[in-house]
Regions:
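N-terminal Rossmann-like dinucleotide/flavin-binding domain of flavoprotein oxidoreductases
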Residues: 73-98
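Chromatin/DNA-recognition segments of nuclear transcriptional regulators
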Residues: 57-70, 79
Length: 425
């Protein structure tokens, strides 16, 4: 009995020592210079690092990390991060929340009690929102707090789409669901009390990809697309921002080349054994690359006044015939890679949010440049203290960041002035 108790005490003490050392390591880990509120962000990064290690271990023992129990675990963890804690009372009395089904797809609606539409517009101005999570993780429920805050701040009705996710439902399932819901809203605007002339599509990360793709398909009906840290292309993984985050492991739990490449592979239903080909930019034919390489010419398309990087895109120079025929077809599909739509002159007005600490930074900036070049009205806001996913901390949860609140304030001002045509201070 005494030996057993002693062993238990030794194990307990050992765990305390290990935990204390781990906390010490996290607290003293170097953070990227220039990142505001780093003491909060280091813990977001650590959560992602732990998930990454766990995913690696599961992969090593042959467990598919996209299985439903793992999704539930990840979604629960991020739900705690994004939403109020149980003992907090964050009440939006001016927002009505409902669940519904539009054309077979589950949605959650967040409707302000007071309608902010201009007098000549019947129904609510409406944001159709597509959540992020690499087309694999997260859900509308995880985003509940931020979505309530978005509706409360903007005074727009928000319709959040619970689209199908990979690997169970790869491309084009998520796109089809988002398109179906947006079409349904357009076709049933009167009965849904939606102002048909003020329909906005929006999303962050993978959701930004879906918003851009839907905006292209329904350009005649979309008034504005809001792209927040969007994933827009898998042609080249050596843009300056990808290089920046390959050269130094900055915030790998939040954003990293390996993480984004894996997301694209799951969405595209590409065998993960080919990951090394994508990491080496050998996954597409040189013919296809030549057709679109100008869209990724950082010397031409990155706004020089922003000074986001001193690097240039390293263009593809090799190809592997094992995967390139299949991936070429994906690249050519604007539903999958909206960045490579040949004619973008018809695209709706665009509001783009980019972050300095994000591997996806440069593709959004270069896409914005090409839209401007083709006569599209573009409003670009780059946040030097922002990171991938930072916009979700603008309010609605127990953690709020100043840079996120600034981004929300600027978006609200734009919507009021340019979309609703309201007088602003």
């Amino acid at each position: 009995m005494g030996r057993t108790l002693g062993a238990v005490i030794c194990v307990f003490v050992g765990l305390i020592v290990c935990l204390s050392f781990h906390v010490y390591t996290v607290l003293h880990r170097a953070m990227p210079p220039g990142l505001a509120e780093a003491e909060k962000i280091r813990w977001f990064d650590e959560l992602g690092r732990l998930a990454r290690r766990g995913s690696g271990l599961m992969h090593d023992v042959g467990i598919n990390i996209g299985i439903q129990p793992m999704k539930i675990f990840i979604n629960t963890a991020f739900s705690i991060l994004f939403n109020p804690l149980p003992w907090q009372r964050v009440v939006y009395r001016n927002i009505r929340v409902n669940q519904d089904v539009y054309d077979g797809v589950t949605v959650s609606t967040y409707t302000p009690v007071k309608n902010s539409s201009p007098p000549n517009c019947q129904g609510y101005p409406t944001i159709v929102y597509f959540h992020g999570g690499g087309w694999t993780w997260l859900s509308v429920g995880v985003y509940d707090g931020p979505l309530k805050n978005l509706a409360n701040k903007t005074k727009f009705k928000v319709v959040a789409v619970e689209y199908r996710t990979a690997p169970q439902d790869p491309f084009p399932a998520a796109y089809d669901d988002c398109l179906a819901v947006t079409k349904y809203i357009v076709q049933h605007s009167k009965e849904l009390n939606v102002c048909k002339d003020l329909i906005v599509v929006a999303g962050d990360g993978a959701g930004g990809n879906l918003a851009a793709a839907v905006a292209i398909e329904l350009s005649s009906f979309v008034r504005l697309q809001i792209l927040i840290n969007p994933a827009l292309q898998m042609l080249n993984f050596a843009t300056p921002s990808y290089q920046d985050f390959s050269d130094m492991e900055m915030l790998p739990g939040i954003t990293s080349p390996e993480k984004e490449i894996t997301n694209w592979m799951r969405y595209g239903n590409i065998n993960l054994s080919f990951k090394h080909l994508l990491q080496g930019n050998r996954h597409v034919s040189l013919e296809s690359y030549a057709a679109f390489s100008d869209f990724l010419n950082s010397s031409k398309r990155l706004p020089s006044p922003l000074k986001v990087s001193n690097k240039s895109t390293i263009h593809n120079s090799e190809s592997n015939d094992t995967v390139s025929p299949f991936i070429d077809n994906l690249i050519l599909d604007s539903r999958f890679n909206p960045m490579f739509t040949q004619d973008v002159s018809f695209v709706a007005d665009t509001y783009i949010i980019t972050s300095q600490f994000d591997v996806l930074r440069d593709e959004a900036l270069m896409f914005g440049h090409r839209l401007l070049e083709n006569g599209v009205k573009v409003e670009l806001h780059h946040y030097y203290h922002g990171f991938h996913g930072f916009f979700l901390f603008a309010g609605g949860g127990w953690i709020e960041l100043k840079e996120s609140q600034k981004a929300m304030e600027q978006l609200v001002n734009y919507l009021n002035k340019e979309i609703l045509r309201l007088k602003t201070n």
